[in-house]
């Protein structure tokens, strides 16, 4: 019998499973199987990954699944702000890491509103060689500070990690369309999400593995049931092989939307999306600099998808003045790198196909509001 709602699954079966109602795409359906295969193929292509796992929930779920799979020994964390502090929060709350070592971002100068830079790479490399961790965790883009790690910094981290037998784990949740090539940078585990760089609804953590990462996965066991990364990799493998499997319920409809958004990004061109992301981010940073607004990110480390700037105005910090003009921004948050109580910022997110396909229009809309909130 045909599906009661053909728009959900045009060639689907009449729904009498114990998992879904007629209003959701069934995880056993042919349509969802193709969605999973398409997701795997696109993610492997874009990130030069060897394997893919999808962990239901969101980016933090992906982070914790990776931590509970690979972080039970000695974890070294590059902390560039509040959302890489999240690695420490995961380890501290779970109590499963034998030891953690942290390398923190720091001010690049002594000004009252200093720009921040990641810890010097030579210092981090030396710390890796000294501590000999089992895994190194770093943020590609730090959402609280607007800091991005350049490819050569990531490559140096990976080289040092591999020299001591450690995995290199890179959080790309806030990377936007700045795709990281795992093969070129030596990254073993890369974490992304649907709702930022991929213009889809939040639903899962997307975990990509290099060959080395896949080998380590096969030889380790998670200490979580729901976040068992090896199990979620096996689920994806079942779909890749033309079948299906179940561990916990997948967000099927949201993953269908993610697949469609990936296809739209592919039609735009992954390189074109990346170039538009840089153009947009650089232009927004210039717009703010012309008004005397200071960036939290030091030159050379300024992310194009997240622009974080200083403000002394509490109604700019909390976003109220922007909301009054029709724009939703993100409030400033601490960095957790000993920045002091006076630290006060506001954050602009520049994610999504609608912005990247119309950089000029996006800049014009934002400029109209910035002119009112922060006059030149």
Regions found by a protein language model. Give the residues of each.
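Conserved active-site segment immediately N-terminal to the catalytic lysine
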Residues: 183-195
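Active-site C-terminal subdomain of aminotransferase-like
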Residues: 195-286, 354
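PLP-dependent aminotransferase-like
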Residues: 61, 71-134
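Conserved N-terminal alpha-helix of the aminotransferase class I/II PLP-enzyme fold
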Residues: 17-62, 69, 80, 86, ...
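Internal helical hairpin/lid segments
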Residues: 74-77, 250-320
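Active-site phosphate-binding strand-loop segment of PLP-dependent enzymes
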Residues: 110-176
């Amino acid at each position: 019998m045909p599906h009661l709602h053909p728009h959900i699954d045009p060639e689907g079966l009449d729904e009498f499973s114990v998992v879904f109602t007629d209003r959701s795409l069934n995880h056993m359906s042919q349509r969802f199987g193709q969605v999973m295969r398409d997701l795997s193929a696109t993610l492997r292509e874009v990130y030069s990954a060897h394997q893919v796992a999808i962990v239901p929930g969101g980016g933090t779920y992906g982070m914790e699944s990776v931590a509970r799979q690979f972080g039970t020994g000695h974890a070294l964390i590059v902390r560039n702000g509040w959302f890489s502090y999240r690695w420490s929060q995961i380890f501290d709350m779970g109590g499963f890491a034998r030891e953690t070592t942290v390398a923190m971002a720091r001010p690049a100068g002594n000004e009252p509103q200093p720009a921040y830079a990641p810890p010097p790479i030579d210092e981090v490399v030396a710390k890796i060689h000294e501590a000999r961790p089992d895994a190194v965790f770093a943020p590609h883009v730090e959402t609280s500070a607007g800091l991005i790690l350049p490819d050569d910094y990531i490559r140096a981290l990976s080289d040092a990690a591999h020299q001591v037998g450690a995995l290199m784990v890179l959080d790309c949740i806030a990377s936007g369309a700045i795709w990281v090539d795992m093969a070129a940078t030596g990254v073993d585990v890369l974490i992304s999400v649907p709702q930022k760089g991929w213009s889809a609804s939040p639903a899962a953590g997307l975990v990509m593995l290099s060959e080395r990462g896949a080998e380590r996965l096969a030889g380790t066991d998670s200490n979580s049931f729901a976040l068992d990364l090896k199990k979620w990799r096996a689920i994806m493998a079942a779909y890749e092989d033309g079948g299906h499997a179940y561990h916990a319920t997948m967000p099927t409809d949201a993953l269908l939307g993610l697949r469609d958004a990936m296809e739209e990004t592919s039609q735009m061109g992954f390189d074109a999306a990346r170039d538009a992301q840089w153009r947009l981010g650089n232009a927004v940073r210039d717009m703010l600099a012309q008004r005397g607004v200071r960036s939290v990110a030091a030159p050379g480390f300024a992310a194009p998808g997240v622009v974080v700037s200083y403000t002394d105005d509490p109604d700019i910090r909390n976003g109220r003045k922007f909301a009054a003009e029709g724009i939703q921004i993100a409030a400033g948050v601490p960095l957790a790198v000993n920045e002091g109580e006076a630290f006060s910022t506001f954050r602009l997110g520049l994610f999504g196909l609608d912005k990247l396909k119309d950089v000029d229009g996006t800049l014009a809309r934002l400029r109209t509001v910035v002119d009112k909130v922060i006059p030149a």
